[in-house]
Amino acid sequence: SASSLVKEAQERLKLNEDNLLFKEINGNLGELEAKNIFDAARKGDEFSKDLIEYESDYLALGIGNLLNIINPECIVISGGMSLAGDEILLPIKEKLKKYTMPPALENLEIKVGVLGNEAGIKGAVALFI
């Protein structure tokens, strides 16, 4: 999730300030958002790329477990992680091969949701309307 990505980044930034991400947020860890990490990664920041790679492994593991159990035809990445686009989709797709039985990957479609960071709250509101 975007919040776990931010928490991991905050912990790592306490130990390593020599990167573009730290400069982009002017050292203010409390202001860090997932979007900052994705933007820095797009600018070539290896620190941010490593964070995305780390998070994509956990997402692939979770998605792989779902695929192995219920085998859906489509997975939608939404919320704050959807802001990453291909930066998160490509590593997830690659890592799914490690965590998923091959038949579950045959007809799988992975998409990025269009609701962005507000997907969860909009879904919750829709349930009550």
Walk through the language-model features, giving the residues of each.
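ATP-binding/phosphotransfer module of carbohydrate and carboxylate kinases, centering on a glycine-rich
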Residues: 1-129
